[in-house]
A protein has these predicted regions:
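PPIase-associated folding chaperone regions across multiple families
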Residues: 7-8, 15-25, 32, 123-175, ...
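N-terminal targeting/tethering segments
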Residues: 21-129
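Soluble non-cytosolic domains of exported or imported proteins
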Residues: 70-87, 99-106, 133-142, 174-178, ...
């Protein structure tokens, strides 16, 4: 999963090639090289987004502010950018002759059928959802994924063992320097780390599985300098005081998973950077009046998820 379909696919919007267009018909949202993206496509992605975010954060999430806009505006914008991205990726795939093989087409057909059959008649008629159009949508996302795999498989991205290393630590944390010095003295007297952590840590938590980039750099440097069984001296980071003990300086299984995740992120970033140039050169017609009518917070939640259904397709 490169995160192409997933909500975590963050893409910057260069926006330079998007032209507001009228007279595109009420079911059409976008056009690139004569190929259409339908209102249905947006409704399908909005259903996923609404159910996912409301399950995690309840419906109060939509009015929260993020980067100067509401979370709803932010998510809606991400969906717009994603639809345009998939549309343009299909244009590039066409130029490169990337098509689906027979097994992939079968997978798409089954996915579209499954999705269509989970909808009520009323849901189908509202955005003119047909099995053919769903088949096209699954096909286009699959082709985009295939193009992505194709373009990123040749990338030579190095990740050092140390960058991906996941370590297990225990820590003692206090708000004042006096307190941490007391704790340090008690450790030196031979008290167990666990007992002292329980005594000083206000929330009772004292263990953490650490990856690079998660904590303040001073904390990270001190933690990553330790070998298994070693303890740090007093570390000051972001206004708090810590003593860190390393229980494992390399959780091998977690490190492997982390390395894959870092690699996927770097590939996505490299792909986006390269692809944005191509996309900026494309003439994208966008149906703003149709888009204005759609809302994520009041999207119909279908009894089926596009992302889950899409993930049943094996893409070579």
């Amino acid at each position: 999963g490169s995160g192409l379909v997933g909500s975590e696919m963050c893409i910057r919007d260069s926006g330079s090639g998007v032209y507001i267009s009228i007279g595109m018909g009420k079911d059409v949202l976008a056009k690139v090289d004569g190929q259409k993206t339908y209102t249905m496509d947006a409704a399908v992605l909005m259903s996923d987004a609404r159910s996912q975010y409301e399950e995690m954060f309840t419906s109060s999430i939509w009015s929260q502010q993020i980067d100067g806009k509401t979370f709803e505006e932010y998510v809606k914008d991400q969906i717009r950018v994603k639809l345009i991205r998939v549309r343009c990726m299909n244009a590039m795939a066409k130029e490169k002759g990337i098509v689906l093989g027979r097994e992939e087409k079968d997978g798409v057909k089954k996915a579209a059928e499954k999705y269509y059959n989970a909808l009520t008649e009323e849901q189908r008629s509202r955005y003119n959802i047909t099995e053919d159009k769903l088949n096209q949508m699954f096909t286009e996302f699959a082709i985009a994924q295939k193009l992505y795999n194709d373009q990123t498989s040749l990338m030579d991205i190095e990740i050092s063992a140390d960058d991906s290393r996941v370590i297990n630590i225990q820590y003692i944390v206090t708000d004042s320097k006096d307190e941490i010095e007391k704790a340090y003295a008690e450790l030196k007297e031979g008290n167990s780390f666990f007992a002292i952590a329980k005594k000083y840590n206000s929330d009772g938590e004292y263990e953490y599985e650490l990856r690079r980039g998660e904590m303040d750099s001073k904390f990270e440097e001190a933690a990553y300098a330790l070998s298994t069984g070693e303890m740090s001296s007093i570390v000051e980071a972001e206004g708090k005081y810590y003593i860190i003990r390393c229980t494992s300086d390399n959780d091998k299984a977690k490190t492997e998973v982390n390395k894959s995740a870092i690699l996927a992120d770097k590939k996505l970033a490299a792909f986006n950077e390269k692809f944005e140039e191509y996309e900026a050169g494309k003439y994208v017609e966008w149906n703003d009046s149709e888009w204005e009518k759609l809302s994520v917070s009041s999207a119909v939640i279908y009894n089926v998820k596009f992302e889950d259904t899409f993930n049943t397709i094996t893409i070579n």
